[in-house]
């Protein structure tokens, strides 16, 4: 469950850190004198292998590793890998079976002919990225061939010890950096100099700003404007060990407590190119079922099935869309995974309820935590013990405490665990036909710290007071260097011990892997096992929501941003967190709408649903101890929900097409403005607005008491989606103050776009059966223009999202205006599926046409229209208009009553009267 213990846990960690008197993380200007390159070899696979010798040993943070092996390879035209490890012994790396990628040559294997002692600067050139190096001391730089910019330049000494690795790069001050998460960034999406960015998965509430949270993504995007042209690149340090990354504006320093340096440099040069190339490496985002793009409702505290039934009924009565109803652990028997409470959720009644909602297209999802209750009569525990699947400490299962009380944690690096987990999912699915799984507390969260035993003679937990207070008998574990490493990362923002409120870092996984190394991939490994289990059981496209994430998690799961607050600041922060996860390759993301705790105000919940209706993953979720906050609880919030979610359900075909685009190219569903306008530097720090796709912009109210919003409009024409006669024309880009009364959100569509929509509905299944419309946006008042759009449709629960299976259709839409003629046409790939559904385009709305809007000689597929249709035109009004008054007149033309088949190529044209 989304743990309400988070704020308490954070306070306890702070107190413990103060009690134990942990000194602040030490900062050394220089640790040693680095390494020299003593030889370099060319390998048959096109890479280069070098050997580095330490120049001067020291004992700061441990002994230096004397000899290092350098491996450099241009893996693709746009990706360069730089891998540095111990030359003599294999070191921990992110497992290749979890994150498949090319493996460097084996350590110690000599390849090729050595070129001894080259003292001059050398270069290894690729298509776009150039690797250059010096030999004594060894440094390296990565440059872009096309504009000669240095992207990465190791200016200070390389440090490589068993438990401390350090490397730095210089940066131009004009660079804009994004990423290095998961982190709630109070200052927005753009990284702020002189803030430490700690990467180590923790159950720390997202209300705690600028600290390490649930996921670890050691990747950043660097966007620079060079001579008026934008260039973006990315740097990934693929390492699962805890690390601090210090960004000082003109430099960036990594301080890592284990593993290897495994750098990947991604060339770009556009932000979209970057995520395409990045997800080509880490895995394309998972395809999501259509229903998952609908609205979701959850709460910790739906005490029995009757409450859940009432929630579903009340959404229907309020005419607020709802696709998915969720259970936190209220459905469980004693908080135990894969169980059902026989009193609160009797199986027969639950099955009848699920049969009812499944028939109308609704879905049901429940929570699952990794901790398995230590209970001899509990079947899941019995089978786990028999299969020997738990993480060990000194040969015995490591004991912790979570909601069921004493628990053991499954080791998802063990193949036997994956099989056992899949079997438990099947058993539960046979018991309750769930439609997805929500995996929580998988950082891993533990209510205790250290080595614990179950107390004799007393119940744990006692059943009195909060369930998150540790009731085991525990003692600190500091006897090994894995529990007390020489360098203290800034864990939880207070330099807490790395094993605090989680698994002891000297515990062991399969094949002797230490928790110290594998800690931050626990949630990732659980996600992969859960995905495999659901796929095998359902045979459908899995839907998984995970709190903890790592590099590559987006290939399997969606993410929500954890335990946020019902505050205006949490609302603001939700946008930058969402945008960061799009860059990380996890595009299906959102925050708890209205906040997890405490109770939001009515005004805040109004404004939050106006933002959250456009999160890729849109869910209202609340804490056990907070008052009810379903969207129908306030009349004004219900109005805002019907308005904002009504728009979401109309654009579901567009969102689903973005889901397909994300799966094929990694493109985020929700994007910062600079993704579409990288040359417009005003966008670089904007975290108060966002785009869906390339051209659908949301400009919400984010402050209390405001009834207008100042929105940034990049250059071009923008049309309001709630009243398409309203337009903003921004020649060079400008900020515009727009009215935004309580139940109103500003949503604009950019020029040169064709947007497919449907009529909406209260459930996505119903909305999907309605006729299509196309909104075509040209530059306002243009006598010539061009627009494009896309539409992807399929049988949405098929495991794969692709063309070629006979159950999907892809359409490219085009439109042009010129010489007094408006034309639009489609090019359909594999139209059979769309034709089988009978989908038609019933209406076309064309925005920005120059003139009076007179329409004549409408033709479809080369023949005059004989069917009676309705044509109307309205003149645009401008919030900010064209500067040339003679061109200031433009119109919206709508043609209704069409029956153009989505699954068949068509062309349509008409003549226009121009005044």
Swiss-Prot record:
EC number(s) reported in the record: 3.2.1.177
Catalytic activity: Hydrolysis of terminal, non-reducing alpha-D-xylose residues with release of alpha-D-xylose
GO MF term (any one): alpha-L-arabinofuranosidase activity
Tissues of expression: Expressed in roots, stems, leaves, flowers and siliques. Expressed in cell types undergoing cell wall modifications, including trichomes, vasculature, stomata, and elongating anther filaments. Not detected in pollen.
Cellular localization per UniProt: Secreted, Cell wall; Secreted, Extracellular space, Apoplast
Gene Ontology process terms (BP): cell wall organization; response to cadmium ion; xylan catabolic process; xyloglucan metabolic process
Gene inactivation effect: No visible growth or morphological phenotypes, with the exception of shorter siliques. Loss of alpha-xylosidase activity and altered xyloglucan composition.
InterPro entries given in the database record: Gal_mutarotase_sf_dom, Glyco_hydro_31_AS, Glyco_hydro_31_C, Glyco_hydro_31_N_dom, Glyco_hydro_31_TIM, Glyco_hydro_b, Glycoside_hydrolase_SF
Presence of the UniProt keyword Secreted in the record: yes
Chain positions carrying an annotated carbohydrate: 153, 304, 375, 476, 490, 819, 888, 907
Keyword annotations from UniProtKB, A to Z: Apoplast, Carbohydrate metabolism, Cell wall, Cell wall biogenesis/degradation, Glycoprotein, Glycosidase, Hydrolase, Polysaccharide degradation, Secreted, Signal
First-tier enzyme category under EC: hydrolase
Function of the protein: Glycoside hydrolase releasing xylosyl residues from xyloglucan oligosaccharides at the non-reducing end. Has alpha-xylosidase activity against xylan oligosaccharides. Also has alpha-glucosidase activity against p-nitrophenyl-alpha-D-glucopyranoside. No activity against p-nitrophenyl-D-xyloside.
Family designation: Belongs to the glycosyl hydrolase 31 family.
Protein name (record): Alpha-xylosidase 1
